[in-house]
Each structure stands twice: as structure tokens, then as C-alpha cells.
């Protein structure tokens, strides 16, 4: 049975006991409202560790002033049942006071330069600062051997890997594959904001990503591929923040040079719902 923990001292005691037994510990951080994508991360963690801690914390410092912190869906009972079903050992439920004992205004903040400034960083200033701040605290609380993050938030994964290297966290970072609906839409907690009319439209993002990948692999000019992706998404009713081709480290590829590995990334709004997705190749 899953152990739900709200006290940091108790959490540390549990993890310390696992350590004394020589067990390997994994952390799966989440903001709750869990779906099959999240549960796949827990199952991946179980392959790399003997015990799994999953945290649920809706982090106020990674939401912008006009974003959806207050209305972000919270489903604690369903989250607990789902985590127990996939073999999570501990559900860590810290309070805002536990995460930010000096308050969010006075807290020490972490900023990862360069990779935090582009794409999502341009459209959500301060977002990755909040992400890194809370993830570093979770690392210090749980002291995991391995931590698992979803590849749907690909830029977040790159940012966290850079933070782990730079701050010498002795933690292996794993990226879990995107889990999709039958029509290709990436599973997301924000999909439930979509209306019945918008839901079929949303799958156009994945189809556009496939077209971007195919065009690049056929020798298409990156700028032309990106422009066509924007046109296609706008024709489907989206307001596009970006539709880009990048190298795996998120650097821009040089036109005219064939890239052996890359990633197509899209962020776009359908009505009031902002969706992100990507496709590696």
C-alpha cells in the first residue's frame, strides 16, 4: 500500500531506512492531476530503482501572473489511487510552507542560463527559474539516485540535466517517452480545458510535427519547414508561439547541413488552452 507523507522529517526517515538496506531510490516529480503519461514515468522509475517516491506539488513559482495556477486541476484521491496501482511506494505531498519556508518572495532562486532563455523561456519568463528552484529542493529532500521527467516537456528536461551537471547533483536523469491519445495528441493535464469542438483540432499539432520531421529528413530548408508548420497550424485555428527545428541540445541547426538527430517543437494556443508537444528524430 502506498505511504502518503506530508512531513519532511518522516520522508527523510523513510529514505534513510531504504539507504541502510542498500536500496536504490527514484523520484518522479509531478504537479498532480495525473494521467497515463505520468504513470508511465513511475513504471520507468521502477525499472531503475528499488523504491519510488512521487511528489505532487503545484508549484506557484513556475506560473506566470496571467497563467492558470489557481485553476490548475487538483485531483488528490485519483492521483493516489493511480500511483498505488503502478507501484509507487511513497506519495510526497509537501505544503507551500515546507517547500518555501521563507516565503516565495524571499526564497533562493535558481536560474540556468542560455537554455532557459529560449522557446518556453521567451513566452513564459521566469518559468524555468521556478522549475529549477522546486526541483532542486525536491532533490535535497528525497536524495534520489535517479529522477524521471517526461519528454513532453523536452526543454524542461534539457534545463534540469544542465542544472544537475552544473551543481554536481549525484542523480541520474531519465526522460520518459511521450504517451499519446489514439489520434496522436500528447497526454496533458491541460487537455481537459479543450472543448468538444477543439479536441479533434488539437491533434493537428502531432500531425504537423510529423510533417516537420519528414520535411527536414527529406532535405528541407529549416526556415521553410518552420514557416510551413506555422501556416498549417494557423489554418487549423491555432495561435502559434513557435514551431521550430532544433538540435537535441536545443541549439539552432545550420541550414544546408544535414542533421543526423534533431527535434521538432511546437507551442500553440487553441482558444485559451496552450499546448506544447515535440517529436524527436
Swiss-Prot record:
Subunit structure: Homodimer.
Species lineage: Bacteria, Pseudomonadati, Pseudomonadota, Gammaproteobacteria, Lysobacterales
Gene Ontology cellular-component terms listed: cytosol
Misc note: The reaction proceeds by a bi uni uni bi ping pong mechanism.
UniProt keyword annotations, A-Z: ATP-binding, Cytoplasm, Ligase, Nucleotide-binding, Pantothenate biosynthesis
Name this protein carries in UniProt: Pantothenate synthetase
Biological pathway: Cofactor biosynthesis; (R)-pantothenate biosynthesis; (R)-pantothenate from (R)-pantoate and beta-alanine: step 1/1
GO biological process terms on file: pantothenate biosynthetic process
Alphabetized HAMAP family for the sequence: PanC (MF_00158)
Entry-linked InterPro entries: Pantoate_ligase, Pantoate_ligase_C, Rossmann-like_a/b/a_fold
Chief localization: cytoplasm
Residues binding (R)-pantoate: 62, 156
Top EC class of this enzyme: ligase
Record localization: Cytoplasm
EC identifiers of the protein: 6.3.2.1
Amino acid at each position: 500500500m502506498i505511504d502518503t507523507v506530508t512531513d519532511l522529517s518522516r520522508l527523510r526517515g523513510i529514505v534513510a531506512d531504504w539507504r541502510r538496506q542498500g536500496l536504490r531510490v527514484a523520484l518522479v516529480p509531478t504537479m498532480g492531476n495525473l494521467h497515463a503519461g505520468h504513470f508511465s514515468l513511475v513504471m520507468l522509475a521502477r525499472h531503475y530503482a528499488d523504491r519510488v517516491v512521487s511528489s505532487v506539488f503545484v508549484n506557484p513559482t513556475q506560473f506566470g501572473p496571467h497563467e492558470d495556477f489557481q485553476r490548475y486541476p487538483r485531483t488528490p484521491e485519483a492521483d493516489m489511487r493511480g500511483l498505488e496501482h503502478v507501484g509507487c511506494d511513497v506519495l510526497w505531498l509537501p505544503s507551500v510552507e515546507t517547500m518555501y519556508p521563507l516565503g516565495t518572495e524571499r526564497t533562493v532562486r535558481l536560474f540556468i542560463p542560455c537554455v532557459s532563455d529560449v522557446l518556453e523561456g521567451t513566452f513564459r519568463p521566469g518559468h524555468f527559474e521556478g522549475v529549477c528552484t522546486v526541483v532542486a529542493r525536491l532533490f535535497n529532500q528525497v536524495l534520489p539516485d535517479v529522477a524521471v521527467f517526461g519528454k513532453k516537456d523536452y526543454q524542461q528536461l534539457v534545463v534540469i540535466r544542465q542544472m544537475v551537471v552544473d551543481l554536481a547533483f549525484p542523480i541520474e536523469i531519465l526522460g520518459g517517452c511521450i504517451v499519446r491519445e489514439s489520434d496522436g495528441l500528447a497526454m496533458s493535464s491541460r487537455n481537459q480545458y479543450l472543448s468538444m469542438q477543439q479536441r479533434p483540432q488539437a491533434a493537428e499539432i502531432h500531425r504537423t510535427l510529423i510533417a516537420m520531421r519528414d520535411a527536414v529528413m527529406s532535405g528541407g530548408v529549416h526556415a521553410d519547414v518552420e514557416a510551413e508548420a506555422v501556416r498549417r497550424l494557423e489554418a487549423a485555428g491555432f495561435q502559434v508561439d513557435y514551431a521550430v527545428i532544433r538540435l537535441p541540445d536545443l541549439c539552432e541547426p545550420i541550414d544546408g547541413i544535414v542533421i543526423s538527430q534533431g527535434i521538432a517543437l511546437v507551442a500553440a494556443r487553441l482558444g485559451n488552452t496552450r499546448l506544447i508537444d515535440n517529436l524527436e528524430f
